[in-house]
UniProtKB/Swiss-Prot annotation:
Its main location: nucleus. The lineage of its organism: Eukaryota, Metazoa, Chordata, Craniata, Vertebrata. One of its GO terms (molecular function) is cyclin-dependent protein serine/threonine kinase inhibitor activity. ANK repeats lie at residues 41-69, 73-102, 106-135, 138-166. Pfam families: Ank, Ank_2. It is found in: Nucleus; Cytoplasm. Keywords: Acetylation, ANK repeat, Cell cycle, Cytoplasm, Nucleus, Repeat, Tumor suppressor. This is Cyclin-dependent kinase 4 inhibitor D. The modification N-acetylmethionine is found at M1. It comes from Bos taurus (Bovine). One of its GO terms (cellular component) is nucleus. One of its GO terms (biological process) is response to retinoic acid.
Length: 166
């Protein structure tokens, strides 16, 4: 990787992590930095962005950022948005092709992470998009995970969307 590419990746990732929409736009449009350029840590701007800023996600995705880029542990931006509870950002990612059925390195789908963290609105959104029969590395479906946590509201949401396998 060229030093200037790393520098561009650091600048774009830094602006995305700070939530600096204007700088992200300037780098993408004026300096023509590729949205998937890697920073010095091997991450893209979409992977390190401020997840509370769906505008940043939208700008990067409109310019061609991959919504399904995985880090070394298999985590995608959708996993991060679900884990941290940023529903608006997650919706933008899904609208631009994020695969909510891609497991991370622990076998967890984004919905598993949302259940684990107790993000009701994220679980409700993902319940219609996710494979609710998928088991993580511990062998649990999202519903079983919610049951183990004693999270009745999450269990109710998941039960409404779970169809018995044939």
């Amino acid at each position: 990787m060229l030093l200037e590419e790393v520098h561009a990746g650091d600048r774009l990732s830094g602006a995305a992590a700070r939530g600096d929409v204007q700088e992200v736009r300037r780098l993408l449009h004026s300096e023509l930095v590729h949205p998937d350029v890697l920073n010095r840590f091997g991450k893209t701007a979409l992977q390190v962005m401020m997840f509370g800023s769906p505008t940043i996600a939208l700008e990067l995705l409109k310019q061609g950022a991959s919504p399904n880029v995985q880090d070394a542990s298999g985590t995608t931006p959708a996993h991060d948005a679900a884990r941290t509870g940023f529903l608006d950002t997650l919706k933008v990612l899904v609208e631009h092709g994020a695969d909510v059925n891609a497991p991370d390195g622990t076998g967890a789908l984004p919905i598993h992470l949302a259940v684990r963290e107790g993000h009701t609105s994220v679980v409700s959104f993902l319940a219609t998009e996710s494979d609710l029969h998928h088991r993580d590395a511990t062998g649990l479906t999202p519903l079983e995970l919610a049951r183990g946590r004693g999270a009745q509201e999450l269990m109710d949401i998941l039960q409404r969307h779970t169809v018995a396998p044939l």
